[in-house]
């Protein structure tokens, strides 16, 4: 029987500083609010902006990294999965929550925007990601891990070396042979 897919990809800005707490076993749990903004046209052709707020949770090593390096306003790429929880509040009423449990994170923006490399400590360095299209300076800092179970300690993801591709072979024909 086929399994389902539960995958969320977000690029947005933090609406608050991360809130990091530790379990009794020492595992980090970091929570942030992430804002994503989309544009669409209304019936009259005017652009309408809509901002959605997402609750994102990071576990383990990924939680430690998020808590240490992310700040309010930081732009971040997050991959994870939706999780719906039901709990009883302090007032005795059943409550529901929807969170994104992150398993991968990429800090975006320059150093002044909360992302980027060059910070000291035990943080593994990573070269800047490949850029598609124009310029812009996206900083490094891609990390994976953080599933949220069993108190596992997740290691930072290491960038795989880019595969070298040779140029395609040149065909043996002259420009005059092209029919247009």
Curated annotation (Swiss-Prot):
GO biological process terms, semicolon-separated: DNA recombination; DNA repair; DNA replication
Organism domain of life: Bacteria
Domain SSB: 5-109
Biased amino acid composition, Low complexity: 157-169
CDD domains: SSB_OBF (cd04496)
Record function comment: Plays an important role in DNA replication, recombination and repair. Binds to ssDNA and to an array of partner proteins to recruit them to their sites of action during DNA metabolism.
Subunit structure: Homotetramer.
Keywords: DNA damage, DNA recombination, DNA repair, DNA replication, DNA-binding
Disordered: annotated segments: 107-180
Positions with biased composition (Gly residues): 109-121, 132-152
GO molecular function term, any single one: single-stranded DNA binding
Motif Important for interaction with partner proteins: chain residues: 175-180
Listed GO CC annotations: nucleoid
Protein name per the record: Single-stranded DNA-binding protein
Database matches in Gene3D superfamilies: Nucleic acid-binding proteins (2.40.50.140)
